[in-house]
Amino acid sequence: MEKDKKTWSGRFSEPVALLVQRYTASVGFDYRLAEYDIQGSFAHARMLAATNIIPQTDLEAIEKGLTQIWEEIKNGQFEWQLEQEDVHLNIERRLTALTGDAGKRLHTARSRNDQVATDIRLYLRAAIDEIIDLIYGLQYVLLDLAEQHAATIMPGFTHLQVAQPVSFGHHLLAYYEMLLRDGQRLQDCRKRVNQLPLGAAALAGTSYPIDREQVARELGFDDICHNSLDAVSDRDFAIEFCASAALIMMHLSRLSEELILWMSPAFGFIRIADRFCTGSSIMPQKKNPDVPELVRGKTGRINGHLVALLTLMKSQPLAYNKDNQEDKEPLFDTVDTLKDTLTIYADMLAGLQVNPQAMRQAALRGYATATDLADYLVKKGTPFRDAHETVAQAVRFAENKRCDLGELSLADLQQFSAIIEQDVFEVLTLEGSLQSRNHPGGTAPEQVRAAICRARSQLPD
């Protein structure tokens, strides 16, 4: 094939303008699909030979040529050419140069439409497997940290106001559960990714006696796509992945927001290792939580990629349209960003320094055991709404005295309810509050440790 000649140029009376070449070429980013393009071509060629569509000698030449091309790509010796538009035609050009007519026969019973759909699915399947493993790694770090702090008391918040005491381990386990669902979503998404489009050709299938099941088996697909129009035109599997990725990033963004708050002097709950922070060019004292801030910021970009793909697909008629070329950069960046975020997050949390004293002191502020006092009254026969009102009055009284509920005298408390007795002070302690939530899903240290054991049994070794 001549270097400047297009595979489809026979129909046209003049060459494509250089600006149009640059505008329409995708090889600048879809070269990343080369490994998967070659995998698909190996399987396609073997099927063509097995069904006697091409001779065995052509298969041998194609396999040898593809092997050489992959070595050239891995070694940085492959010459990517803009005028060949994309990863597929660049590889085909080189294969034809190496093998002659055998290389020209590889595209029999195949279109770039089903070829690229196959490449993307192979790429995304591998990415999902890697991301799931990274989620497991982060979950193990969360469990290790939660185990260390199963009994470390911190304030639980609603509306960012002190609500009730919780254990820091219990708080961390909330993110374990979020990541558990995130991993399950990806595993479910993988089922829909793992279907073979190859054989759909341009849009209507092919007149050759192909064996799609053979190709599916060789490439590890669970099934074939059962409608040729759908196989080449939809990218819902990529959108589903990006939605799952956006949820993962959203969860990590929430944790990042908390790390940023907890690291501030106003909280002082944690210290993030220096290697994850930067300083200020003007303020010598500054230690800025750049990694959590960037996770929070990059989440917006991942959300944007999801919207971009949805918008890309929303008005396309069947079947394939050139619009779909724009699916790759958002998808690639989503995969790259998510993998980097999960990797760096596991390392950052593993080196987290926790200040239990600061957490405990914060839990003592804000009347975190007020609900425990209300529950105490209910257990002694007071209707909950009456108990709620009684404790609210006691809190206002304590505020005026600038002390905690547990620092009031028994006589002070009995002003609000005569049924309050000396045993009330057991439930007004932070430890008593934690211990009283001793049921599955509760924040009692015993339940936190049980939850950690259960969680470890859910993860692979």
Curated annotation (Swiss-Prot):
One of its GO terms (biological process) is L-arginine biosynthetic process. The keyword Amino-acid biosynthesis applies. Disulfide bonds: none annotated. InterPro entries: Arg_succ_lyase_C, Argininosuccinate_lyase, Fumarase/histidase_N, Fumarate_lyase_CS, Fumarate_lyase_fam, Fumarate_lyase_N, L-Aspartase-like. It is an enzyme of class 4 (lyase). Its main location: cytoplasm. PROSITE patterns: FUMARATE_LYASES. The keyword Cytoplasm applies. GO terms for cellular component: cytosol. Pathway: Amino-acid biosynthesis; L-arginine biosynthesis; L-arginine from L-ornithine and carbamoyl phosphate: step 3/3. It holds the Pfam family Lyase_1. HAMAP family: Arg_succ_lyase. This is Argininosuccinate lyase. The gene is argH.
